[in-house]
Amino acid sequence: MTGFTPDAPVLHEIKNHSEALAQAEAGVAAMAAARNNRWYPKFHIASNGGWINDPNGLCFYKGRWHVFYQLHPYGTQWGPMHWGHVSSNDMLNWKREPIMFAPTLEEEKDGVFSGSAVIGDDGELKFYYTGHRWANGIDNTGGDWQVQMLAEPDNDELTSATKRGMIIDCPLDKVDHHYRDPKVWKTGDKWYMTFGVSSAEKRGQMWLFSSDDMVRWTYERVLFEHPDPNVFMLECPDFFPIKNAEGNEKWVIGFSAMGTKASGFMNRNISNAGYMIGTWTPGEAFQPETEFRLWDCGHNYYAPQSFNDGERQIVYGWMSPFVEPIPMQNDGWCGNLTLPREITLGADGDLHTAPVAEMDGLRENTTDFGTISLGVNGEQTIADDAEAVEIEMTIDLNASTAERAGLKIHATEDGAYTYVAFDDQIGRVVIDRQAAAQGDRGYRTAPLSAEELASGELKLRVFVDRGCVEVYVNDGRQAMSSFSYASEGPRAIKLVAESGTLEIKSLKLHTMKSIGLE
């Protein structure tokens, strides 16, 4: 295909960017002034006010970590997308930066959609993102018209940027509207770009482009087509090499699949983010060697983006409130990101994702409970009122007889709680929200391998923030992220055993510091 990659960027300004950014800042500030903090996170990244979704433009640049994110600054529902921005020099203490992008060009007049950041050969950063317009010029009833855009920062602090314009147009006869979320990397002496596409036949694909100068791009081929004909779009694609401890390299293709059907424990969310591991030769199609696997098995995880800081592959995900009711929309804000996770390729041939080592620096006070034994249907309160904590615990599977055992978090006086447990009958870790007083309910499960079950112990790291929980199983072999809307009053954490006994080999509870965004 040719004719849709211009020789030079194309742009048509329809609004003043500085004025649009000032209006967006005022919109966020108005909602922040009236924000209810009952579920607002203490150690997760969220906007000061308004709606957020996908993490964007993740990078470590000139000594600072930068996290951008999709932002609607005028409401707590999805709306015209901007790019919010926070930065940190240590991943522990974050500061709010000016909003980076507002939709001001004809090519993006209905939204500055998701994209990535990459450092060029000259050491300077470039932003690639999707410009979004409604195809009928009015609303979503006529579908999308989406193109790929380029911008460059004005300073090393990344507090503002200059939009260069459209670099890849959309061949409308080859695409069923969806055409977005560019990811750029270098292999050998060429730059490559991929993004998600819904083909004219409504098949979810990732297209591959190449460039010598990061500005002029040439279409190469379809990098990957999802084998499931129900999947019509691959949002927020990711693509990166990774080596195991022995130095053997694989390629990972990640995407958020739209159209997957639930089957048993798999794909229970409206859309599901996952990956495949395989091989890739530049210019060729990706060759998967594994089935589709979920990045995260919780209720609320979507649109992850990873980046390499020179030593580690780090990923953030969006804790996505897809299913109504969404109580936090009444509080002046909606949505937060997960903790940053390091991706590693384990000896088992699968990816592991665990909180980056820096997260240990958020711990303030630690209570070491040592070993704990609970009798049949036993219960022990380990925190009377836990606003923001991390729990490390190891369950002795061989010595425990409980059918389910674990932690009731956000346990309030009205009887509401969220349950993080090991279910012996199904051999899985569960987040169960059946006792939640507010928000969506249901449960999600993370599988344990036969090897893990046979090991005789289960290690859990449970991060509890004001309105969400993240669970890491056996050093990151599985991860789970879910919202948990606590009722009013003290929020206890209780260790429980159901229909049997529980033996805990070790349990520590750490209170967590704020990351400075409250």
Description of each model-found segment:
Residues T2-D181, K186-L234, K243-C297, R312, ...:
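Beta-rich carbohydrate-recognition and catalytic domains
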Residues G3-F4, E25-M31, E246, T279-E518:
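Beta-rich accessory regions
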